[in-house]
């Protein structure tokens, strides 16, 4: 028998899976694999496509599934070529309306309709500047949603029976196991959409009515690594420049997933002169490639963890080290030791506030006296939607809003309205709001004494720029709305007590 690696499937994946029949060609000969329940009509179709004598073999269901996975994952090159450079001429909504019934798709001679639908979906997502595509399977419908400017909105509801075929094709493209539906899977693919280089991270998750898929889009052409245009004020930028010029210590950026932490760190690195410093990173994954910087990716399959990668980097004579995320006590301990031995360490933490990073590191086992010595600053950030400049309108602040913002009632505030330019959302694009905790002598002594967040923020006083106060400044400037600031920030601890 010819090895599976040398055989090419001749039937479209959808047909092979639906009818439990595979036709594999090695060039000079063909083999047909089926199940005991395979219909005679499917075998006749295989014979028609083969157009030559072939060997027929019936397999058990488990063996058939394994061969199906192996054969069509190796054949994904053709689909990759079809998606290698997606043009701009595809219209998602027209394609969805013109898509034939699912049964016709399964019986079609190629998988082009499904691939075209996926192409159109990706093209539309890039056009809308979406960060994520959600493909969600429910009992009676299939739903596709885009996350645009941090908010999900429904885009399309294709036929419910299309779910399995659509998700299976995405799995093939991401080199995932198409037969495995019981466990989550993660993969990625690199595409060109309208001439733009786009990395797509794929995550699947079993649910009660079928699999859910989330595609995270990383559009390398749209990356802005300018801290000013990312929303920093000139005064804050001067403080950040001073921090990254320090020879050693730890600088942390905190916030939830999708708040722009990695982009901020990349932008900070881009302000350093890589010709005079050895700058190295350990990331999961490498999101953007920076010239002159040594970037290493975490690989759990070979036990290449953040901690292990960081240890190796420290033997490479680095000046500046970026650790994608401090996830555990081991990584935290190594980062602290690195900062105490002459290295500048930049990293991220998942905490809700800058002050929360201190207690999080202590919970990970970092001793207060080491933390107070090594930590230079913590910056917490959020992304807020920008008001659409074409339709925003001014309204006087009511009493509740004025009280929350500590302004006079009736003060004019800009509000979202909605127009064709912003998709009738009232917002277009996003900007950052930032809270920077500089570890000065006062904060250093408080950390050393083990004081909690409430005590710390009370000591910092009203001059301390919390996230909500930073958002207030942007709302007063008409950059965003106060409702948007409330959506992404929490009430400062001192005010909540």
Swiss-Prot record:
Q: Where in the cell is it found?
A: Cell inner membrane
Which GO MF term does the entry hold, naming one? ATP binding
Cite the binding residues for ATP.
255-262
**Pfam families cross-referenced by the UniProt entry:** GSPE_N1E (PF22341), T2SSE (PF00437)
Similarity section: Belongs to the GSP E family.
Catalysed reaction, written as an equation: ATP + H2O + cellular proteinSide 1 = ADP + phosphate + cellular proteinSide 2
Q: What is this protein called?
A: Type II secretion system protein E
Q: InterPro entries per the record?
A: AAA+_ATPase, GSPE_N1E, P-loop_NTPase, T2SS/T4SS_dom, T2SS_E_N_sf, T2SS_GspE
Can the keyword Cell division be found in this entry's annotation? no
Positions binding Zn(2+) in this chain are: 388, 391, 419, 422
GO CC terms of this entry: plasma membrane; type II protein secretion system complex
Q: Which biological process terms from the Gene Ontology are attached to this UniProt entry? A: protein secretion by the type II secretion system
**What UniProt keywords apply to this chain's record, in alphabetical order?**
ATP-binding, Cell inner membrane, Cell membrane, Membrane, Metal-binding, Nucleotide-binding, Protein transport, Translocase, Transport, Zinc
Quaternary context:
Forms homooligomers; most probably hexamers. Interacts with PulL/GspL.
Function, as annotated? ATPase component of the type II secretion system required for the energy-dependent secretion of extracellular factors such as proteases and toxins from the periplasm. Acts as a molecular motor to provide the energy that is required for assembly of the pseudopilus and the extrusion of substrates generated in the cytoplasm.
The prosthetic group or cofactor this protein requires is: Zn(2+)
Q: Does the keyword Aminoacyl-tRNA synthetase apply?
A: no
Identify the enzyme class: translocase
UniProt-listed Enzyme Commission number(s)? 7.4.2.8
């Amino acid at each position: 028998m010819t090895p599976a690696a040398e055989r090419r499937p001749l039937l479209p994946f959808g047909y092979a899976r639906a009818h439990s029949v595979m036709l594999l060609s090695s060039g000079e000969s063909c083999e047909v694999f089926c199940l005991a329940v395979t219909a005679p009509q499917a075998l006749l179709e295989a014979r028609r496509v083969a157009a030559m004598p072939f060997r027929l073999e019936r397999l058990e269901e488990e063996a058939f599934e394994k061969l199906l996975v192996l054969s069509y994952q190796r054949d994904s090159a053709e689909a990759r070529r079809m998606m290698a450079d997606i043009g701009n001429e595809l219209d998602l909504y027209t394609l969805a309306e013109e898509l034939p019934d699912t049964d016709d798709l399964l019986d079609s001679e190629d998988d082009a309709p499904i691939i075209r639908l996926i192409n159109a979906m990706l093209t539309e997502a890039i056009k809308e500047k979406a960060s994520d595509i959600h493909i969600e399977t429910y009992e009676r419908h299939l739903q596709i949603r885009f996350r645009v400017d941090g908010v999900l909105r429904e885009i399309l509801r294709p036929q419910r029976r299309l779910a399995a075929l659509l998700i299976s094709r995405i799995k093939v493209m991401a080199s995932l196991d198409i037969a495995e539906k019981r466990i989550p899977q993660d993969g990625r693919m690199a595409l060109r959409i309208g001439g733009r280089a786009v990395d797509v991270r794929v995550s699947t998750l079993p649910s009660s009515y079928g699999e859910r898929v989330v595609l995270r889009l990383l559009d390398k052409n749209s990356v802005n690594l300018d801290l000013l245009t990312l929303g920093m004020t000139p005064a804050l930028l001067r403080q950040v420049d001073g921090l990254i010029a320090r020879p050693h210590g730890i600088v942390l950026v905190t916030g939830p997933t999708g708040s722009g932490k990695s982009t901020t760190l990349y932008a900070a690195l881009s302000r350093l002169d890589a010709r005079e410093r050895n700058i190295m990173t350990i990331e999961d994954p490498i999101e953007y490639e920076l010239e002159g910087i040594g970037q290493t990716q975490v690989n759990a399959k070979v036990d290449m963890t953040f901690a292990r990668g960081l240890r190796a980097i420290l033997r490479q004579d680095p000046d500046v080290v970026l650790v994608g995320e401090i996830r555990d006590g081991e990584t935290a301990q190594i980062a602290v030791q690195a900062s105490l031995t002459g290295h500048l360490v930049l990293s991220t933490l998942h905490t809700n506030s800058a002050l929360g990073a201190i207690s999080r590191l202590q919970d990970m086992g970092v001793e207060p006296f080491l933390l107070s010595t090594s930590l230079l600053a913590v910056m917490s950030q959020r992304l807020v939607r920008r008001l659409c400049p074409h339709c925003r309108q001014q309204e006087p602040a009511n009493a509740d809003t004025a009280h929350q913002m500590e302004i006079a009632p009736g003060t004019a505030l800009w509000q979202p309205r909605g127009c064709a330019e912003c998709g009738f959302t009232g917002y277009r694009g996003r900007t950052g709001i930032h809270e920077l905790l500089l570890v000065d002598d006062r904060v250093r002594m408080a950390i050393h004494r083990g004081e909690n967040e409430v005590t710390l923020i009370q000591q910092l006083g009203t001059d301390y720029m919390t996230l909500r106060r930073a958002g207030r400044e942007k709302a007063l400037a008409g950059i965003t709305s106060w409702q948007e600031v409330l959506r992404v920030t929490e009430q400062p601890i001192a005010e909540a007590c």
